[in-house]
Amino acid sequence: MRTLMSATKNNVYSVSQLNSEVRHILEGQIGKIWLNGEISNFSAPSSGHWYLTLKDAHSQVRCAMFKGRNQSVRFKPVNGQQVLIKGAISVYEPRGDYQLLLESMLPAGDGLLAQEFEALKLKLAAEGLFALETKRPIPTNIQRIGVITSATGAALRDILHVLARRDPSIEVVVYPTQVQGATASQLICQAIVTANQRMEVDVLLLTRGGGSLEDLWCFNSEHLAHAIYNSALPVVSAVGHEIDTTISDYVADVRAPTPSAGAELLSKDKGNKAEKLALLLSRLQQGMKHYQLQQYGRLTQLSHQLQRHEPQHKLQQFEQRFDEIQMRLENALQHKLSRLTLRHQQLHNRLQQRSPVNTLTLEKQRLGYLIERFNDASKDYFKQAESRVSQAAHNLDTVSPLATLSRGYSITSTNEHVIENANQLSNGDVIHTRLKQGSVTSTVTDVSTK
């Protein structure tokens, strides 16, 4: 295979060859990693695959989690959520983007514990604590069982109930201890040591009921693992529910999925051989787990080599490309729909503006406005006219003869001619005098021009 440093003018990479070569380098040299960060740009198209961006305060990386993997995730990721993910570095060749192909995803709190759990499991496996050849056989004729658990917990009640039903002759010695909290692991170790010092039981049943990963964390202690491994008494681990797995399950001689199952495993049911089969199955499970753990590293290495020639990578590339095109198409359709909706609204508004009803309404409003202006103008006009008439009347009254009469003057006339000068009269003429109130008819008896 060519290396990137070998390219010359006569040996030039194509873009596709470059992206393929970079993918092989990243997948071969880095492989799978754990990564902690915040989810953003999460999308879950109809194909069932998940696409997201994992970021911190300074950087981000794209991630893809295909349907076969994300079905095991116990929560629905949301933007802004802190998570711990495990994935393999790869390159999405069509775009030349490097990305993580995710295998698992946990909430940040559980994720850190799970990462610590995996690290401790690998360490103890390397030390040989899980080796099948170190497992102690469980006695076939058990007379007395030592139960290490809480004296007030439901697990002890379940165990006593099962033993009373299946084999009441079995005695139970309880080594009470805390099974949750910061000091629980140390107290459980002390209970195992005490039981080994007394040697009064045939087998130890280490147990408690179900709970969260934090609740069961005391059973993932390295000190507890060594205490179980160093015990002279056989130890059966029956912690939590069937889906829960602890370090004590790997180190113990036999693992039972529940406290009740542990009691059934260690008791006989009127000659029923089912418990023997269950014991063998449990031992087989332990052996398989150990074998799987031993082969994990080799399988991982072979997996990386196989991926270079496996069509699954191409299929994932095609699926991711399909999802990318589908999301782009959906976004384009949504954009087109938004534009059509906006255009429809604009046309609707224009139609409303030109509607006869709206036009009539606007004309009515305009007519009302004109009528109001006409009324106001009419009022102003008549008011001004009234003022002018009043002023004219005043002016007329000022020059009116009647106004003169009202000030004590009179008008004298003869034969309908106003007498302005005494020379116009002679003795014996009949004259008419107009007063403010009424008139007087007189006969001239004397005329004076002075």
Curated annotation (Swiss-Prot):
It is an enzyme of class 3 (hydrolase). The keyword NAD does not apply. It catalyses: Exonucleolytic cleavage in either 5'- to 3'- or 3'- to 5'-direction to yield nucleoside 5'-phosphates. Its EC number is 3.1.11.6. GO terms for molecular function: exodeoxyribonuclease VII activity; nucleic acid binding. Keywords: Cytoplasm, Exonuclease, Hydrolase, Nuclease. One of its GO terms (biological process) is DNA catabolic process. The keyword Methyltransferase does not apply. It is found in: Cytoplasm. GO terms for cellular component: cytoplasm; exodeoxyribonuclease VII complex. Belongs to the XseA family. Heterooligomer composed of large and small subunits. Bidirectionally degrades single-stranded DNA into large acid-insoluble oligonucleotides, which are then degraded further into small acid-soluble oligonucleotides. This is Exodeoxyribonuclease 7 large subunit.
